[in-house]
From Swiss-Prot:
Gene name for this UniProt entry: panD
Keyword Cytoplasm: yes
Catalytic activity: L-aspartate + H(+) = beta-alanine + CO2
Record EC number: 4.1.1.11
Cofactor note: Binds 1 pyruvoyl group covalently per subunit.
Family that this chain belongs to: Belongs to the PanD family.
Record: residues binding substrate: 57, 73-75
Organism, as annotated: Bradyrhizobium diazoefficiens (strain JCM 10833 / BCRC 13528 / IAM 13628 / NBRC 14792 / USDA 110)
UniProt-recorded name of the protein: Aspartate 1-decarboxylase
Cellular component terms (Gene Ontology): cytosol
PTM annotation (Pyruvic acid (Ser)): residues: 25
Record note on modification: Is synthesized initially as an inactive proenzyme, which is activated by self-cleavage at a specific serine bond to produce a beta-subunit with a hydroxyl group at its C-terminus and an alpha-subunit with a pyruvoyl group at its N-terminus.
Subcellular location(s) of the protein: Cytoplasm
Function per UniProt: Catalyzes the pyruvoyl-dependent decarboxylation of aspartate to produce beta-alanine.
Gene Ontology BP, a term: alanine biosynthetic process
């Protein structure tokens, strides 16, 4: 049996941009991607803390240490710059792996700088 667990999370990041006319995705600072164990093109769930909206998209890389957290394409209609969001990636594990697995949780400040991971 496979069990789906949270693999990585970036907690309470601040949206820096919402670009309706860019190809759909979320651009995330590479430093945050690496700390959360996320990879380019990975499917992620986005939870908007301000509105309660939840949606899925995929990851593209933004420059490291830029603090970028940009929702692009149709997803740009679901956020506003300054909104707090939670970005979560999931993975499937067999039961034995699931019992041992520890997710990467990255907490950030209002400028999307790592506070703790």
């Amino acid at each position: 049996m496979q069990i789906t667990l949270m693999k990585g999370k970036i907690h309470r990041a601040s949206v820096t941009e919402a670009d309706l006319h860019y190809e759909g995705s979320i651009s995330i600072d590479r430093t945050l991607l690496e700390a959360a164990g996320m990879v380019i093109n990975e499917r992620v769930e986005i939870y908007n803390v301000e509105t309660g909206t939840r949606f899925a998209t995929y990851v593209i890389e933004a420059p490291p240490m830029s603090g970028t957290m940009s929702l692009n394409g149709a997803a740009a209609r679901l956020v506003m710059p300054g909104d707090k969001i939670i970005i979560v990636a999931y993975a499937s594990f067999d039961e034995a792996e699931a019992k041992k697995f520890k997710p990467h949780v990255v907490r950030v400040d209002r400028d999307n700088r790592i506070l703790a991971s």
